[in-house]
């Protein structure tokens, strides 16, 4: 069935919208979107017209003057510097930007990124001891270090350290030579939303300003890449950086980014923040998840085109491996959920031996999308489970774990995502306790996802011009989400599945001017509920579809519901007719589910509606006549089973439910 969603339409404020229209000259739909994002005239002027000259003075960051003096002194003394990074895209890009910059200043600089599985996130004492033994004079952290008080304390007398980080600052700040973090309580820096690469970039700016008396604006495309990937609010400085970085990415990108764009098949596209988040960043992230993040840094700091091209291809292949690992674990997890039955009604908890810990967080996110419940995915190794958690709106997964801290080995995180470890023999106990916790805390309504809609649009008003006007709000991201619109009544002219695995759905709507295309990713089940002539309401974002020189609007479906649903009615005679059709369609061989469904819709008897005809497949699966499975290439298939003797329809739950 189509997953139910709560449709929430933003109320807007006509008076505020009129002020924005009058003062800023924006289109009414843009004014409505700005009001929905709580942007007033002053903020709106900066939001729409902000430039690189509006970036803040880096020296208003606490300890920046100390850090600049120490870095320049170390360079002038020809002493070795090590950048200590992190394995996610923010850490990779922060390492790359600072490394490239310090090389320009003539520094003796290298970088160190911990291995995800064996070392984990952040500073570790063993690595620092190794750097000290190598004769390192100065360590500069990027995207980490703010919570490493004890580790810094253990080495501070033997090595100079500068911490640059953007994570929430604890009460005990490490006693490094300098700590640059805009979230420190006594830091006067006005913008509190910088990413790790953003903080590293501010250090570069301060150093360049001291050396050359001008703004440093190189590598903005790399800074933009890390900023978008880390899902920080795209307002203030972040918006300016990403907007300028995207311009550079589309005009004259870093060689590594260019090759990454090429292998991702985006070389003919205008790169947007969406392309960064969904296509480029995962390829960099794959290195840290599956192999080692240093390869991603090498991609961004190497100038040899042949080497960079080879690394880009390698990262692309690593990403395929990551996708395959993720796909396999996801499928095993789905089977686990199905086998749990009602045990999975309130919280999704799945576990498997030797599941790759680098991808369990992604799998957890996919399971939340699928089942919309707080989700824990656990990889078991040597009797210990390492878990990754993702939550639903309004539910604090960290608090949920804290309620079970007595049976956890360790845990950490925040409201939306967390991690933990546990003895494998206590996973069932964890499931029982979290089920009880979720049952008490989460309401039935909160288990239904919300689709927030900015504005209604009549189907006949959608054209390329409105997309161009709305694009003034780009780049989109956290705190400036992609606008979502709704058509409250549209008629389906055609519907089809697309993609190699037939797992995406294309719908064509009727308009007074012709037709309007829409895409629903990973929604093959729509084919069973929406048909030619179905009248629906649909929530969507807008994008341009460019094909053979033609540009047209395209809807990217967020939610869709039929305004009326065909009733399912099953009869013995109707199923007999469908048995003949399906048998002829399959011809005793395996066929893709999509091909069989298409054949059913073409050949069904006139007295059966579409849903009833397609539901016959479920009856025949329950009777063992056909068997559903996934092919080696990931396609959903049906296998015909030759069964002798008479079958009893009352053994089919589906038939008993819908029989007339």
In which residue ranges do the predicted regions lie?
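Hydrophobic helix-and-loop "lid/oligomerization" segment in the mid-to-C-terminal part
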Residues: 2, 10-137, 158, 208-429, ...
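Generic detector of well-ordered alpha-helical packing
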Residues: 87-91, 144, 166-167, 182, ...
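Acidic, two-metal ion nucleic-acid-processing modules in DNA metabolism proteins
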Residues: 98, 103, 239-334, 369, ...
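Generic structural signal for hydrophobic
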Residues: 131, 154-155, 620
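Histidine/acidic-residue-rich, glycine-tolerant segments that coordinate divalent metal ions
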Residues: 142-194
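Histidine-centered active-site/metal-ligand motif
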Residues: 166-167, 182, 356, 414, ...
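Short alpha-helices
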Residues: 174-228
């Amino acid at each position: 069935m189509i997953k139910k969603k709560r449709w929430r339409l933003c109320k807007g404020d006509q008076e505020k919208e009129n002020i924005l229209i009058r003062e800023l000259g924006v289109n009414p739909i843009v004014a409505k979107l700005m009001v929905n994002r709580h942007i007033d005239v002053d903020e709106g002027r900066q939001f729409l017209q902000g430039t690189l000259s509006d970036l803040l003075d880096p020296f208003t960051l606490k300890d920046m003057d100390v850090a600049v003096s120490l870095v320049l002194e170390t360079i002038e003394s020809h002493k070795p510097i090590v950048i200590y990074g992190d394995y996610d895209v923010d850490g990779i890009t922060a390492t790359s930007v600072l490394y490239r910059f310090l090389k320009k200043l003539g520094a003796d600089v290298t970088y160190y990124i911990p291995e995800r599985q064996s070392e984990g996130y952040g500073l570790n004492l063993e690595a620092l001891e190794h750097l000290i033994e190598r004769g390192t004079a100065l360590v500069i952290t990027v995207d980490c270090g703010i919570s490493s008080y004890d580790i810094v304390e253990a080495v501070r007398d033997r090595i100079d350290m500068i911490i640059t980080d953007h994570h929430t600052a604890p009460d005990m700040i490490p006693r490094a030579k300098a700590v640059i973090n805009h979230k420190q309580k006594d830091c006067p820096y006005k913008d509190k939303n910088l990413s790790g690469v953003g903080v590293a970039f501010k250090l570069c700016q301060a150093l360049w300003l001291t050396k050359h008396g001008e703004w440093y604006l190189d590598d903005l495309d790399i800074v933009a890449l890390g900023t978008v990937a880390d899902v920080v609010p795209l307002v203030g400085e972040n918006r300016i950086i990403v907007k300028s970085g995207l311009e550079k990415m589309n005009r004259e990108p870093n060689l590594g980014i260019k090759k990454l764009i090429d292998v991702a098949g985006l070389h003919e596209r205008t790169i947007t923040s969406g392309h960064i988040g969904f296509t480029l960043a995962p390829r960099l992230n794959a290195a840290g998840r599956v192999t080692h993040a240093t390869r991603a840094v090498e991609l961004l700091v190497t100038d040899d085109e042949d080497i960079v091209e080879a690394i880009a291809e390698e990262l692309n292949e690593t990403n395929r491996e990551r996708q395959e690992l993720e796909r396999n674990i996801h499928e095993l997890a789905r089977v686990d959920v199905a086998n749990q039955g009602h045990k999975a009604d309130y919280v999704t908890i799945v576990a498997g031996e030797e599941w790759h810990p680098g991808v369990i967080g992604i799998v957890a996110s996919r399971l939340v999308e699928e089942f919309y419940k707080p989700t824990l995915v656990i990889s078991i190794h040597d009797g210990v489970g390492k878990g990754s958690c993702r939550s639903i709106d309004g539910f604090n997964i960290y608090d949920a774990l804290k309620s079970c801290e007595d049976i956890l080995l360790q845990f950490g995180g925040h409201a939306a995502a967390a991690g933990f470890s546990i003895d494998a023999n206590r996973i069932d106990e964890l499931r029982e306790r979290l089920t009880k916790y979720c049952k008490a805390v989460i309401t039935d309504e909160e288990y239904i996802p919300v689709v927030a809609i900015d504005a209604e649009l009549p189907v006949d008003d959608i054209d390329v011009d409105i997309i161009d006007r709305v694009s003034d709000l780009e780049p989109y991201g956290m705190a400036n989400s992609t606008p979502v619109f709704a058509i409250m009544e549209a008629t389906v002219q055609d519907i089809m599945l697309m993609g190699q695995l037939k797992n995406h759905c294309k719908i064509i709507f009727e308009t007074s001017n012709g037709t309007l295309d829409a895409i629903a990713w990973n929604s093959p089940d729509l084919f069973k509920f929406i048909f030619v002539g179905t009248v629906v309401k649909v929530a969507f974002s807008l994008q341009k579809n460019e094909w053979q020189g033609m540009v047209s609007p395209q809807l990217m479906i967020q939610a869709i519901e039929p305004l009326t649903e065909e009733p399912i009615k099953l009869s013995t005679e109707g199923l007999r007719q469908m048995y003949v059709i399906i048998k002829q369609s399959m011809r005793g061989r395996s066929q893709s589910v999509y091909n069989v469904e298409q054949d059913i819709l073409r050949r069904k008897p006139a007295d059966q509606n579409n849903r009833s005809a397609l539901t016959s497949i479920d009856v025949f699966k329950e009777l063992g006549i056909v068997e559903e499975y996934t092919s080696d290439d990931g396609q959903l298939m049906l296998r015909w089973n030759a069964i002798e003797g008479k079958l009893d329809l009352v053994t089919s739950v589906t038939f008993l439910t819908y029989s007339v």
